Every structure is written in structure tokens, then in C-alpha cells.
């Protein structure tokens, strides 16, 4: 079956709206253009990841910033780790095909309280955690973590 991007985007907007997770001033259509991966169960969208390319100034490098949302009834099943690993793989492959974009890895800003125990570890080495390394904090005190690609080279 062919991928239906318009359906995935509409389903993602519906999921974000149902869960009330988008900032009030953000057009959901903008976030939908950032979709990276989606998962369905019995025809219902149960999770999405998004990716935004941006510089991480303290590392002087460009990363894909990863976000993930899993529907509450499907959480605590390892889906977020699966989304993370899969999204990282997609981004790494894309980065190799587009070296002019100079995307050197995947970054994430930790927002989930479910990761509080992991957040005490500077490097996340557990299976599926992609070796995410703590590199700093946002102004709101949230952890910034990165996973460098094997092909990454600094200028």
C-alpha cells in the first residue's frame, strides 16, 4: 500500500489536537510538514515523530531536532525508543545523500518526565537510546542531548 502523506498529516494534526500538545500560536500545518515517521494500529495513528534541521550553536554543528509523541494508551511499550532509532536511521541516510546540508547527527530536548531517571546519566547507552549524550540545557532547564552520525565530520 502506498504511503498517503496527506492522510498521515491530517491524522497527526488530529492526534496533536486531541492531546492538546501544540503551542497555541503554532499552525498545526507547519508542524505536519516536519513529520518524519508515523505508526498506526488498526487504522488509528498511535504515534509520530517530527524532525527540524537547525544549528546547535554550542557545538557549531547542524542537527535534526527530534520530537516524538505516542498516544497515551500506547505508552510504556518501548515505542518512543523505536521511533527514535528509526527516525535517527532515516535522518542519517538522508544526511549521507545530502552532504551539502551538513547535518551531523540527531538532537533532542528532553521534555518527558518518564525519562527523569535516565536524565541522571550523561550518556544514554541503554538499548534503543542511541547513545544520546548530554551537551547542555535550554533556558528553561531542559536537557539537550545529541547522537552524532558515524559519518559526521566537523569543519
What are these regions (language model features)?
Residues 1-3, 12-68:
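A conserved beta-strand-loop-helix scaffold within acyl/acetyltransferase catalytic domains
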Residues 57-58, 96-155:
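Terminal substrate-recognition subdomain of acyl/acetyltransferases
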Residues 41, 69-72, 110-112:
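Short, flexible loop/turn elements at secondary-structure junctions
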Residues 70, 76-93:
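Conserved acetyl-CoA-binding loop-helix of GNAT-fold acetyltransferases
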Residues 19, 23, 90-98:
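Solvent-exposed amphipathic alpha-helical surface segments
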Residues 64, 86-90, 104-110:
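Hydrophobic, well-ordered secondary-structure scaffolds
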Amino acid at each position: 500500500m502506498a504511503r498517503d502523506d496527506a492522510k498521515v498529516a491530517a491524522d497527526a494534526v488530529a492526534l496533536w489536537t486531541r492531546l492538546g500538545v501544540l503551542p497555541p500560536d503554532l499552525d498545526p500545518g507547519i508542524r505536519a510538514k516536519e513529520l518524519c515517521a508515523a505508526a498506526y494500529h488498526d487504522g488509528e495513528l498511535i504515534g509520530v515523530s517530527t524532525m527540524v534541521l537547525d544549528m546547535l550553536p554550542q557545538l557549531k554543528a547542524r542537527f535534526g531536532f527530534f520530537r516524538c509523541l505516542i498516544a497515551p494508551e500506547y505508552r510504556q511499550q518501548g515505542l518512543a525508543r523505536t521511533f527514535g532509532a528509526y527516525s535517527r536511521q532515516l535522518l542519517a541516510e538522508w544526511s549521507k545523500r545530502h552532504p551539502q546540508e551538513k547535518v551531523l547527527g540527531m538532537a533532542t530536548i528532553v521534555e518527558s518526565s518518564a525519562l527523569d531517571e535516565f536524565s541522571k546519566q550523561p550518556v544514554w547507552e541503554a538499548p534503543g537510546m542511541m547513545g544520546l549524550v548530554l551537551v547542555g540545557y535550554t533556558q528553561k532547564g531542559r536537557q539537550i542531548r545529541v547522537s552524532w552520525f558515524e559519518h559526521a565530520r566537523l569543519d
